[in-house]
Amino acid sequence: MTTRYIFVTGGVVSSLGKGIAAASLAAILEARGLNVTIMKLDPYINVDPGTMSPTQHGEVFVTEDGAETDLDLGHYERFIRTKMNRRNNFTTGRIYEEVLRKERRGDYLGATIQVIPHITNAIKERVIAGGEGHDVAIVEIGGTVGDIESLPFLESIRQLGAELGRDRTLFMHLTLVPFLGAAGEIKTKPTQHSVKELRSIGIAPDVLVCRGDRAVPANERAKISLFCNVEERAVISLKDVDSIYKIPALLRSQGLDELVIKRFNIDCKEADLSEWENVIYQEANPNGEVTIGMVGKYIELPDAYKSVNEALKHAGLKNRVTVNIKYIDSQTVEAKGDEVLQGLDGILVPGGFGERGVEGKILAAKFARENKLPYFGICLGMQVALIEFARNVAGMADAHSTEFNPASPFPVVGLITEWIDEDGQLELRHEESDLGGTMRLGAQLCHLKEGTKAAEAYKGNTCVERHRHRYEVNNNYVDRLEKAGLIFSGLSSDRKLVEMIELAEHPWFVAGQFHPEFTSTPRDGHPLFEGFIAASLSHQKRILG
């Protein structure tokens, strides 16, 4: 199979939405029957985003094979059916680590190691490997053209363009076309300068995607075409929209997919975007709304919970309601108590690390349990629910996780001390182990207990979900907690680890050690999120009478 490559770069400013644009183009090409994958090349020195602050970088998206990746890979999976893996995201740090390891082994036979050709060759090899087996591979380059960090990646794709030829490569550049209110007009000069910068390093863009708060008029697109030496039909206007799921149709209406197909000389069917039209219709025509309180510690940056936010929206589509998310700082719950939890239709406690704000999350779980309010706990959200139950129902007053209180007399949650790494080797871990790459990661089979809400949601006795954590329920306390009324509704593939808990005498109190948000999509939703929103809607109706 001959793979074609579309390289996506960004200019003028960051956060233009390269990932959304790349994913939307991929969705159109997939709708034309093509097998598409997407890669993200990140120019930072970190080996992966696993140890980066969520308030700086946003969430860490976990793939099926356990890679800790950029949040853009979440967008990719939500827009196309192809599942991402560790080949779909790599960083400058990963490349340098790989090259330096080879140098230490003597693989370069005494050569002087340089950015060109050794670093660029390593980048090119990964890009080619990531695209294998697909009709089209879209490669997003992180950062902004002009940044010093991006230069090795840009040089690598320049070389690939020359080596593979025009019939197998296409360069798509996103730029900002701002509207100046004082002047009352759109300005194209930033785009012209960005293209000039890109051309100065040897890359001539084939497509320009012009971002702005309004559509770019035909005369301005003609001007951009003239000064940037790009065909006028290849100057695409991408205005702000109220839903990212409208973007595939917006790009298709301007013929972007047709331009790509003709460039690559691919024979394929017309795009069928009916699934996306249905998503847009459901989003625009809700029958009600619910308010979900998300009690977390990274709420100053909503992207820290990007996949959770999207999964709640998807569940809203399936229940035909708008989901309003109220972000609640768990430290505020500690300071003010129940008053900040009033008026909610459901509470969701997402994952997180560290002691800050954990007591607020425990209070949120207690409030939901005592007030029969739908509760959904994810990862740490399950652990705090279990800790709360142990303290206030099972009679273990000082119960805690050893992550937060190693001296707790009732360590109901403890560190995973033995684990199998990605190479199948046994690893021993302790509190002083490295933070990066030392967690239980990736898709794992879970056995569901018959007659539980978990089994009802999944419509079966097993599920497969992705994990990202170091701590697990301490099996020494399972019997005591079970006798107190806690239901262990999900167990690991070997039935040795607790994966899900729930309460019997509660309308909907369900929590999982895994991250179901990573597999939710706008077209398919996710059974647990759908069940949670359905329960929240039912709670609202009961309250309103």
UniProtKB/Swiss-Prot annotation:
Q: Which reaction does it catalyse?
A: UTP + L-glutamine + ATP + H2O = CTP + L-glutamate + ADP + phosphate + 2 H(+); L-glutamine + H2O = L-glutamate + NH4(+); UTP + NH4(+) + ATP = CTP + ADP + phosphate + 2 H(+)
Q: How is its activity regulated?
A: Allosterically activated by GTP, when glutamine is the substrate; GTP has no effect on the reaction when ammonia is the substrate. The allosteric effector GTP functions by stabilizing the protein conformation that binds the tetrahedral intermediate(s) formed during glutamine hydrolysis. Inhibited by the product CTP, via allosteric rather than competitive inhibition.
Region entry Amidoligase domain, spans: 1-266
EC number of this enzyme: 6.3.4.2
Q: Name one GO biological process term.
A: 'de novo' CTP biosynthetic process
Question: Keyword set for this entry?
Answer: ATP-binding, Glutamine amidotransferase, Ligase, Magnesium, Metal-binding, Nucleotide-binding, Pyrimidine biosynthesis
Active-site residues, Swiss-Prot/TrEMBL: C379 (nucleophile), H515, E517
Annotated residues that bind CTP are located at S14, D147, I148, E149, K187, T188, K189, P190, T191, Q192, K223
Q: Which PROSITE patterns match?
A: GATASE_TYPE_1 (PS51273)
Give me the residues that bind Mg(2+), please.
D72, E140
- Additional comment: CTPSs have evolved a hybrid strategy for distinguishing between UTP and CTP. The overlapping regions of the product feedback inhibitory and substrate sites recognize a common feature in both compounds, the triphosphate moiety. To differentiate isosteric substrate and product pyrimidine rings, an additional pocket far from the expected kinase/ligase catalytic site, specifically recognizes the cytosine and ribose portions of the product inhibitor.
Q: What does this protein do?
A: Catalyzes the ATP-dependent amination of UTP to CTP with either L-glutamine or ammonia as the source of nitrogen. Regulates intracellular CTP levels through interactions with the four ribonucleotide triphosphates.
Family annotation (PANTHER family): CTP SYNTHASE, CTP SYNTHASE-RELATED
This protein's name: CTP synthase
